[in-house]
Amino acid sequence: MFLLVALAMTNSRNKGLRFELQVAHLIDDELGIKLYRDLEQTRSADHGDLISSDPSWPFVIECKRYAKGYLPKDDWWQQVCTASKLVRKIPILVYKFDRLPIRVRVPISFVQLLKGEHDWRYYTDMDFPTFCYLAREQLA
């Protein structure tokens, strides 16, 4: 029984790692920005999965990859919002379920490009190409 649980956890961890690397590669392809896995995420809470060596990078990115489902869990969004508030950056949740395309959740203020305080109770989900379009506009 323990071996089965350990194998499932290892496979799950590997699946998450592969997805993080896939997202980093896609962002590099689309935006020309190199992202790296934040190794602090494994040691302490309230860290995103992907970071940039550029301190002006405005996002905290959390990646979630699951077999079943179609909508992200509320605690995934809370996790990335908590990490983002600590470093005053924009929360980005990139998620994928088996046989479905990659989706991205961002706060609505990101889409509207609002300035000032952020109310992260409001958000939008979009496909990955739409996220890259908006990210290019934000970075310009």
Task: Describe the residue ranges of each PLM region.
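Catalytic phosphate/metal-binding cores of nucleic-acid and nucleotide-processing enzymes, i.e., regions
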Residues: 1-140
